[in-house]
Amino acid sequence: MVVVFISILLLLGFTGCTTTSGEIQDWPWQDPEVEQPEAPEDIVEDATLDRWTDVSADYGTLPEYIKVYKSPDKLEGQKAVAYIAVADMNSAQWDIWSINDSEMSGTKDSFKTPSTVYSEGLWPIVVNAGFFYSSGGLNYSSSLAVRASEVLAYNINYASEDWVTIYYPTRAAFLESEDGGFNACWTYYKSGGKHYMYPAPADNTWEAKPAKTPSSAYPEGAEVFAAKTAIGGGPLLIDDGKIRNTFVEELFNGASGIGPDSCHPRTAVGVTADDKMIVFVCEGRQMTEGVAGLTTADVANVLLDLGCVEAINLDGGGSSCMLVNGKTTIKVSDGSQRAVASTIMIK
C-alpha cells in the first residue's frame, strides 16, 4: 500500500478511527407493423472506449455484464498500462472483504492478498481497496468498509505532521445505499457511535490551523451515515459529474505518503450515470519500462472520460492489484501481491 500517515495510534479524547449511458441506437423500420429489436447497449458508450481494447476473452469466461479493457499506450499524455473492469450493476453484484476493525483499536485479523480473497470466493473481479497499517502487533484499517450494512472499519478521523497539531479531516467514501443508488461523499466518525456523511469536505489544509471537528452541523449538509455496501479511501475524485480531487482538504498531501501530485500505481472505483461500476488500476514505478504511473488528477480525468459521475481514489502503490478470474492484470510494483486490509469484489 501507499503508506498512510501513521505508524502509531494516538489515544486522544476521541475514538481514533481509520483512512467517484449507453445510448440505445435507433433502428430503421423495415415494416411499420413489425417492431425491430433494439441494438444491445455497450457496457460503456463506444465514444469513451474508442482507444481501449476489450481483453475480456484473455481472462476466461466472464458474465456477459462484466467486461475488461486495457488502456491505450498513453493516458493523459503519459505512457501507461492500465485496466478497467466495467460491470452493469443492474445485473452484477459487488461486495467488500475487510478486516474487522470496527472498534478502531486494531485487530488480530490477518491482511490478505487479492489472490487469497479470490480463492475463498472465486469472484470474477477482485481489486485492492482501502488504506491500512500495522502497529504493536495489531492490524488497522484506515478506510471505511461496510458489508451487508455492517460497518467493519471507519475512515481515519485524525491526521498530523508533527503529532502536536492534530487535524480532523473528512475522508472519501464510495457507497451503495439501501435503495440501490451509488454515491461518493466524505465521511467522519465521532466517538459515541456518531457517523456522518457530507456533500463537501471539511475545509482543512496543512498550511492553516485545523478546521472545526466535523459534526452534525459541520460541514453543511451532514446526514447520518447509512449504506448497504461502502468502501473508503481518498481523495474523492469525481462528484456529481465534476472533478473534485480533494487531496488538500482530505490531507492526503504532505505526510500522508500517497503523493497525489506524483506518478504512482493507482487504484480507483467509480460509477457512470447508468449504473456501470468501473474499477481502475494502473501500473507504475517502472515495472514496465517508461511507465511511472499516474497522479490522482490523471485518474480523475480518465474516469471522467469513461463516463463516471462519482469516483474515489483507493490505496495505490504496491497495493494496486486487480485480478480477473484470479489472473493478474498489471505488474504489481512490490514484485508480488501485497496483503491488504480490504478488497472490492464483483460478480
PLM ranges: what are they?
Residues M1-V4:
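Bacterial N-terminal signal peptides that target proteins for export
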Residues S135-P260:
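Active-site-adjacent helix-turn-beta-strand microarchitecture at beta-sheet edges
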Residues A80-I84, R171, G232-G234, C263-A268, ...:
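Short glycine-rich loop/turn motifs
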